Amino acid sequence: MVTGIFLPPRNSWRFLALAVVAAVLAGCTTAPYTGRQQVLMVSPEREQALGYQAFSQIERTSRQAQDPALRARVREVGERIAKAADRPDYHWEFVVFQDDKTANAFCLPGGKVGVYTGLFKYIKSDDDLATVLSHEVAHALARHAGERLSQGRLAQAGGLALNVGLAALGVPSVASQAAMQGYGLGSQVGILLPYSRVQESEADRIGLILMAKAGYDPEKALGFWERFATAKKDKAQPPQFLSTHPTDAARIQSIRAFLPEARQYYTAR
């Protein structure tokens, strides 16, 4: 009885390479609004389940804000953004977490959105709040979390194929280890980080469209990001090629370029 397939060592790396290519082709899809080609090897259902699981853990370990007016404000603006996103399959939820030292927000797969109270020192209007929420919702709408998971899987598969290929070629172990270490650094800087910057820029672009569709002025987004950049300019930033986010100057320049597109969707509420 045949229990498996034997691949000669010199051919196994070719098989792995073909398997990686096949997986990439099978997972090709297109991001909304931008039309960017993506590779997604995670199902929407699995991605959303991971998002719900992560959100439950955050709720267990974080304290929610008790200010009813603040919670209602975030929920009202968030629901307008969610309506513009047009994903009725998402279980939208907008929660404010009490942490005045954290100026951050997130949207997990499936529509679970969190905003930390520390962010409100920079938010001067509902348009500012819509800027933040629409950016985070855009990450979920474009399935950036699933894309990142897929990139990690592809990087692992590429490393395995390289390891098998080096062994098949009889490369000495010391040289093989050096090559693998170089591959790890190269995949991080050359593949994973740049994609993260692409996703951030894409979330800015889609976010402007979403806030415009929801009736918030996309022009105000520029002022918010400029103000936010000024407030944190004293904090050291890594070089852009080592950062998961674009530099503040690059982000603001991109937003200026995206605004004409977003204006086409804007009707004042």
Describe each region flagged by the PLM.
Residues 15-16, 28-269:
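A Zn2+-metalloprotease active-site environment signal
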